Amino acid sequence: MIDDNSRKKSLTGTVKKVRKRDGRIEDFDKKKITNAIFKALYAVEGENDETANTISDIVIEKLDRLYAGQTLSIETIQDVVVETLRETGYERVSSEYKSYRERKAELRALRGELGILDAPKLTVNAIEVLEKRYLLRNERGEMIETPTEMFWRVAVAVASAETMYGGDVDAKAKEFFKIMSRLEFLPNSPTLFNAGTDTNFGLSACYVLPIEDSLEGIFTSLKNMALIEQSGGGVGFDFSELRHAGDVVKTTMGVASGPVSFMKIFDAATEVIKAGGRRRGAMMAVLRVDHHDILEFITAKAQPGVLTNFNISVAVTDAFMEAVKNNQDYNLINPRTKLVARTLSARYVWERLIYNAWRSGDPGVIFIDEVNRHNPTPSVGVINSTNPCGEQPLLPYESCNLGSINLSKMLQEDNTIDWDKLRRTIHTAVRFLDNVIDINPYPLKETEAITRANRKIGLGVMGFSDLLIFMGVPYDSEKAVEIGESIAKFVTEEAGKASEQLGLERGSFPNFEKSIWKGKYVARRNATTTTIAPTGTISIIAGCSSGIEPLFAVAFMRHVLDGTRLFELHPIFERMAKEKGFYSSEVLKKIVRRGNLRDIKGVPDDVRGVFVTAHEIAPAWHVKMQAAFQKFTENAVSKTVNLPEDASLGDVEEVFMLAYKLHCKGVTVYRYGSKGEQVLNLGEPQGEDKVTTADAEYAGGRPTKGCEVCG
């Protein structure tokens, strides 16, 4: 497309200075232009660095000719880049680069209008996600708020609960706004969607509904599920009370169709509901391992396209695990009669479970006895299910609202953890989440009653992988596990102190006297305080790694929501590569083909270790990290153990056994490529065309379309 020989003039380099948008003057650096052009070309056309260098030379030549000796603005330089791309035949690249600039300019203008010029930068992808799913629109579909206005809307709504306790609404609104607008803390998506609006939709992410063994009971739960999903919440169910397929139904003299058949009805209903909503529906189906239909349940998602709105998990008991270890039979129970229906080899069922998890990622496992050992209100009820991603065990009808602290914002200048800032953020976040309970318009009266009685909240973290990178600690190391454990311990201890203080101010949760906390706290506002959620979408808004997951890629192409592709490079890696002198377009091309730094020449070993990605990490390290956080987390931890495509059945069994041994409350595996539809696809190290790609809303963890509710 470019004729180098037609360019006769030499580059004089008379442009020496550039004026930044904040007014600062810096030295002109051609490399920045070349890098920007390379990323734009590579994202759209897959062109090489030679083309980028050639176009960059033409840009410099034009700047010298038109603006010799002048100090140029960023906008002027970018205008010339757009013009040059078009003139050299790269019309599509020029158009997409121009659109990218316009989106960035739009956001800067909004910040200026609202007086928050010091606010952290939202990424282009964060803006796309916010605009498509979060920001309010009028009846004509026109956007009527900015990201900053969204944060202020939510802050004011949540702070309004202070009037119930004589608090300072304005002061708390500003405090809540500060931690959200600085991306230090974000609540779960339903709170961002609905707080401060007139929709009367709920603010909680997590719900569990009971299913009674009758047609009326089943369809009552179906109706309740629809009401919850309409507001953006996700629902967990325990199907274990439903009689097994083939069992007698006395009222009709017929036979029961079993839990799996009814799961299909719930799945179909969710499909209809999500068609008119902003988010995919999300559900968790749990079945006890001693249910008569356990084998049918284990294979329920073996075929692609079945039960796509469900995560499914087997509730595994200690007794079953002992039977597996001892190669014994165990009893299956008839839910209707509570009597033994038949016996099965525990080993056989275990192997079926492992095989299907290896084959498709489903089912996961919930260690239900471990969950109930930590039930804060055992006299109130038994926990049988969790929210869709498994991190929030709940009683029947109970709900919980979640929020996560961005750990990448909790560092001092020397990249050590700023414990004082983390403490302050925890206390503000606990108050925020407790307030949500009071202003929440509950979809069901039963949910309101049990939620207000226990006042569970789930404060967690995101950006953990970014924090480790800043600290120079590889994810798959004992040091990283120690850091994870210390953070979890600190967050839970401080959240407990914050809840105790709120209990003294406002009163303990009504079931406090029946809880495990009586005698351990003088007062306590919340039955639980901490949860590690996957934070899929809110971590994109915050511009950090998701939950406690490792990086999924160092460089990749992101398919953004308008159909274009953006070249994304981890910003810390980019800065480090430039500082250490190994940054080049050739290195970037190699990284984007495979997503990681393995075997890429020129990258120092210490850098390669710090930027280790999920599929490079041995499965045991995934489990150890989950266990480290679970040790001090009051609810549960959502994390995916990512396995390479060539992982064996034995690898899956080792993961499940280690998770049980280390007292995880559940475990989920995903073997790369085991589902046809993935939102993350790795490139080929030796291929020229195939690169690592990710969908707009993928931030890490399980690389398939999943729950959009918890974060």
Where are the model-predicted features located?
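Core nucleic-acid recognition elements
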Residues: M1-K17, R24, E47-A157, E162, ...
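Short, surface-exposed, low-complexity cationic segments
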Residues: D29-N48, W152-S160, S546
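Terminal amphipathic helices with adjacent charged low-complexity linkers/tails
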Residues: Y90, E96-L110, A315-V316, F320, ...
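Conserved, charged catalytic cores of large soluble enzymes
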Residues: A109-A173, T197, L242, T251-I265, ...
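Conserved oxyanion/phosphate-binding beta-strand-loop segments in alpha/beta enzyme cores
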Residues: A119-I127, R133, E162-N200, A226, ...
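Function-dense linear segments that define catalytic or interfacial modules
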Residues: A155-M164, F177-T251, V255, P259-F262, ...
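Catalytic alpha/beta core of large soluble enzyme barrels
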Residues: T197, N384, G390-P393, L433-D438, ...
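Internal maturation/activation junctions in enzymes
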Residues: L222, T425-E448, R452, K456, ...
